[in-house]
């Protein structure tokens, strides 16, 4: 979805009422708390503004990066070229009949899980500890405790490559483990509709939701900035176990450390750079592959330029 970059002209920026800004730091907008600046940045407040921003970027011939909660991203210290669109203003939720929930792409997933539990609708208990937005969760097919977004999704609303609104069904999205067709498409998710199981005891659903949250908090390190799970789990063994077996649990490069509690987490211990984290990712891949010939595929989205390539 990119062509040769050019310099956006002042009049085209002005037509978007000053909503597009230059040189905005991205580190505060990610859970890793690292990364450089966005060349151009905007926070649309509705789908019309989103369409305008996408059309502007297309007219300028610059790439677009969508940013939700920033919980599954590693952004280069050099920052990102083109336009970064933050979806945190694109929020809203509707509890429909029969256990259906519609929400906008920027709505935090935890809000949906809590609203469903309060209503006595089962099916999102697992999502309570996932620090992402609905849009990002759909794109990544986020999941936990053996469940995933593809289990509850009935429809996704998108803007296609022409910025026209479309509706897609799960069969259109080629879901897999932490995968969907949306990851490699030029489409922009604007909202989604989920189907849950209504009529349950709200207190029981809320207790189960809280149990999932307690389990997550007890087994995973949330006291320092991280992206969540760094690698997808191979079919043979969990990624964290493989990393621990090659002696990297607690290993540190610069300000970044492979967690001593859960080796599939990398922590920013205070002054980490994106490159520190990236080097730990490369090291974990290298050591695991050397020992077992198992390729650890990153679950975290790695954006921007880094010096050394990952194993592929």
Curated annotation (Swiss-Prot):
Keywords: Cell cycle, Cell division, Cell shape, Cell wall biogenesis/degradation, Cytoplasm, FAD, Flavoprotein, NADP, Oxidoreductase, Peptidoglycan synthesis. This is UDP-N-acetylenolpyruvoylglucosamine reductase. The keyword Heme does not apply. NCBIfam families: murB (TIGR00179), PRK13905.1 (NF010480). Its main location: cytoplasm. It catalyses: UDP-N-acetyl-alpha-D-muramate + NADP(+) = UDP-N-acetyl-3-O-(1-carboxyvinyl)-alpha-D-glucosamine + NADPH + H(+). Belongs to the MurB family. Its EC number is 1.3.1.98. GO terms for cellular component: cytosol. GO terms for molecular function: FAD binding; UDP-N-acetylmuramate dehydrogenase activity. It is found in: Cytoplasm. HAMAP family: MurB. GO terms for biological process: cell division; cell wall organization; peptidoglycan biosynthetic process; regulation of cell shape. The active site is at 178, 229 (proton donor), 299. Cell wall formation. It holds the Pfam family FAD_binding_4. Its cofactor is FAD. The gene is murB. It is an enzyme of class 1 (oxidoreductase). Residues 33-199 form the FAD-binding PCMH-type domain. InterPro entries: FAD-bd_PCMH (IPR016166), FAD-bd_PCMH-like_sf (IPR036318), FAD-bd_PCMH_sub1 (IPR016167), FAD-bd_PCMH_sub2 (IPR016169), MurB (IPR003170), MurB_C (IPR011601), MurB_C_sf (IPR036635), Oxid_FAD_bind_N (IPR006094). Pathway: Cell wall biogenesis; peptidoglycan biosynthesis.
